[in-house]
């Protein structure tokens, strides 16, 4: 049997009512989520501005132009005052403040924010300079996507290329870009890639070129300080030419740093560097360094002292605060471990390994008295190719003198030295080192 027609109509009507109710709930929920997203955006922006001003000394103000459930548009004004400029270079103490304005546009969806930031080249104190240089189309900007659901952020930033010519002098800046993946507080992974730059100075007859610099770093806030537990960088090539046939070329530079906690009170840092080739030439000399390697660790650093030093350095406070932080670190002592310092100089191998220990002391004692030197102890081993003097003639007189004094010993086709530091006394191959 078929249901009565009026029952069918009531069923369809009920479905429509349910659909309308569900739709209304979704719309209201979406609008509520957008309202919440907008309020959260306002709070996060205010917190980030306050943090930027506190940590950098740069003044940042936000002037909203359009505010509704789905939009936050306005202008970010950034001012670098003379006192902040002077902290980087004392000669800038009396200069005028640098003012920049950025167009800041954000689109709000439920629990999702997409933002775009770009320098307005027609505003601020840089505008006349950029106009004179023909850089009205130059871009300095960033865009980001933030999720309040996962409390995550994905951003990218860029600086476009430009060229400045003045007479026969020329400066070329190639594009730079990077990205960030992490949380809304700034804990995450940052990468950057700069294609490089070239400089030609006709007056000094100097040419400089830097090509393909890449870097990445893990960022983390630890006890209120921004630290990088791990970072790395690579530089493909660098060259510098100056009058007198002076030329320096570098290829294949890589670096890596690591910061780890030993326990609740101490930490260790490790720095590694590799150089494929470094050539230095002049009219008189030529030195080729290949297979360069450095592996250096500092262990047992006082955690509280290290954090205080980082905070003092980042805020560019007076020297007394920095010295106080150094004293805090020195009171615990530390160990320097040189796992490897090696290279080939014009084909001949040279290397240095060992470790040095610093007993608890103070900065004043370490720098200004024999008592501070007594806090140092360690043992280093040097190995030099026996033909180093032939390969690098400018080193030959020194090598001959050290060999005659017993500071270098010929052994197993090498020149070897053992440098021992014991409570301030230095010996080389068991012989006291004379100043």
Residue ranges and their predicted role:
Residues 20-21, 29, 34-435:
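Glycine-rich, small/hydroxylated-residue low-complexity segments
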Residues 5-33:
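Gram-negative bacterial Sec-dependent N-terminal signal peptides
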């Amino acid at each position: 049997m078929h249901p009565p027609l009026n029952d069918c109509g009531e069923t369809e009507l009920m479905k429509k009512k349910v659909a309308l109710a569900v739709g209304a709930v979704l719309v209201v929920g979406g609008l509520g989520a957008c309202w919440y997203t907008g309020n959260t955006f306002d709070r996060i922006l205010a917190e980030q501005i306050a943090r930027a001003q506190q940590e950098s000394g740069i003044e940042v103000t936000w002037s909203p132009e359009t505010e509704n459930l789905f939009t936050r548009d306005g202008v970010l004004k950034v001012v670098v005052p003379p006192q902040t400029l002077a902290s980087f270079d004392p000669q800038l103490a009396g200069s005028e403040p640098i003012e920049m304005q950025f167009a800041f546009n954000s689109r709000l969806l439920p629990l999702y924010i997409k933002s775009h930031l770009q320098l307005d080249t027609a505003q601020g104190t840089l505008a006349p300079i950029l106009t004179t240089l023909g850089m009205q189309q130059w871009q300095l900007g960033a865009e980001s996507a933030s999720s309040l659901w996962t409390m995550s952020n994905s951003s990218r930033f860029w600086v476009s290329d430009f060229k400045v010519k003045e007479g026969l002098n020329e400066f070329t800046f190639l594009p730079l870009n990077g990205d960030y993946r992490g949380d809304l507080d700034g804990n995450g992974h940052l990468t950057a890639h700069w294609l490089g730059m070239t400089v030609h100075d006709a007056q000094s007859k100097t040419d400089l070129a830097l090509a393909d610099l890449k870097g990445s770093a893990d960022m983390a806030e630890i006890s209120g300080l921004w630290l990088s537990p791990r970072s790395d960088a690579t530089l493909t090539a660098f060259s510098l030419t100056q009058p007198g046939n002076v030329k320096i070329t570098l290829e294949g530079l890589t670096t890596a740093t690591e910061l780890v906690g030993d326990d609740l009170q101490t930490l260790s840092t490790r720095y590694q560097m590799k150089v494929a080739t470094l050539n230095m030439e002049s009219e008189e000399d030529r030195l080729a360094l290949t297979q360069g390697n450095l592996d250096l660790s500092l262990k047992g650093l006082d955690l509280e002292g290290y954090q205080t030093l980082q905070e003092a350095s980042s805020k560019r406070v007076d020297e007394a605060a920095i010295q106080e932080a150094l004293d805090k670190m020195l009171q615990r002592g530390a160990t320097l471990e040189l796992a490897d310092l090696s290279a080939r100089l014009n084909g001949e191998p040279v290397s240095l390994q060992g470790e040095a220990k610093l007993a608890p002391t103070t900065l004043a004692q370490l720098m200004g008295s024999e008592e501070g030197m007594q806090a140092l102890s360690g043992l280093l081993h040097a190995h030099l190719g026996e033909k180093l003097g032939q390969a690098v003639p400018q080193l030959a007189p020194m090598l001959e003198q050290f060999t005659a004094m017993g500071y270098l010993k010929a052994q197993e086709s090498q020149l070897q030295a053992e440098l021992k530091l014991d409570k301030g006394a230095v010996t080389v191959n068991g012989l006291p080192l004379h100043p």
